[in-house]
Amino acid sequence: MAGPLLAIGVAVVVLILVNSGSTDRRPVAAVPVAAPSPPPTPPPRKPPPEPRPKPDPTDDPWPLYGYDLARTRLFPGGAKLDPPLHVGWRFNDGALLEFPPVIYDNTLYFEDANGWASALSSTDGHLIWHRRIGTLAAASPALDIRHKLVFFTLLSTSPGARVPGNGAVVALSMRTGQVAWSHPLAPGSESSPLVHGLSVFLGDQGGTVYSFRTYDGHVNWTFHGNGSVKGGVAFAHNTIYFGDYGARVHAVDAANGREIWSAAGGDSFYSTPAVAYGRVYLGSTSGAVYALWANSGATSWTASTGAYVYASPAVADVPGLGPTVYIGSYDGHLYAYDADTGGVRWSHGGGGRIDGSATVLGSVVYYSSLGSNTTTGRNWRTGQQVFSFPDGEFTPVITDGKVVFLIGYSTIYQMLPKR
């Protein structure tokens, strides 16, 4: 789950500074300790010849922010993960965890706000490797399982950085944490990467979207938007979709970076889109939720909340209810919208501003609240509360299909379902 409108939290090692007179996201203060820039990129190399490894069938990978390429934030068939849940192990990172980890082969990969990249055993919570690759970060990594690489974006690699600049994308070995390649991103990036085939896609603070070759960092193409691209891109039908801080949503050909369409919105887009039911769903700092037709960019519907929508949506086809979009707002409410019409199915508030994305596991939609520092789970059909936990501010949960991992302010919890 940088730089929103309001001040949202203070940790011992992390201070988030926000200009309350702007809709720009929060600059995140890093520990003022000098850290080297990522090592230089090695010469290009050919992809390894070995076949793509298959995941263990008992370990469902969660390879990128939003779970799948369309960023639906829906884990299918997760009824066995429904509450009640209890804490197994916990790992305290000591720094802000604004965005959740990714998972593969019993390992969690994540970065904290101070630019430390880590691999953690999902079985017992022990640290496998831990490497400082920058000084300021606010994104989830993404996995290239074929080449056993994990990609991180950085807002800065400069010592003591408190604002974006001199950033990078860094590819590390999933096994050892060693640098495979890196590429400088002068404006910095908080865009959670997306991997498809031999390409990794991401945006930067300067408004450029990149397609890199996964195994050596070669730049396939770049696309220049109308403003900072802070959210991640979503992928569907060989097209990537994203919003920018120039108040536009773009659809770009994933193969060559050519624009397919561009649509105007009411204000800046920090929200990472979700693509489903022929539409692109995302929130805006104007307080609106947009549903645009994926093939044209034409508006299908819009809905207004009471405040900024930095959050990203989750989408699910709910039995007895139909296709539904779940998204939180700074007005403190989680909304469930009819995905076809934008009608409100239900809404609940009271916990404080919602900044991170909702996530659906089984029949429960989870979200965290900035004001109360809590994570809440609600029945996806009725909105009835079925879970509460006293930690969490941004995007709260992921799963490997066996257990749930809950992300607090600076702590990762293994949450075990009742057997």
Predicted regions and their residues:
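Hydrophobic single-pass membrane-targeting/anchoring helices
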Residues: 1-25
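Repeat-blade elements of multi-bladed beta-propeller folds
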Residues: 17-18, 59-69, 94-116, 135-170, ...
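Aromatic (tryptophan-biased) beta-strands that constitute blades/sheets of beta-rich domains
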Residues: 18, 24-98, 109, 126-133, ...
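Short, glycine/acidic-enriched capping/hinge loops at junctions between secondary-structure elements
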Residues: 73-76, 114, 121
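Compositionally biased regions
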Residues: 8, 21-23, 38, 119, ...
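Intrinsically disordered/low-complexity terminal segments and short unstructured peptides
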Residues: 22, 40, 152, 175, ...
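Short loop/turn segments that connect beta-strands within beta-propeller blades
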Residues: 121-124, 173-176, 213-217, 253-256, ...
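Short stretches within intrinsically disordered, low-complexity N-terminal or propeptide regions
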Residues: 31-32, 36-37, 121, 173, ...
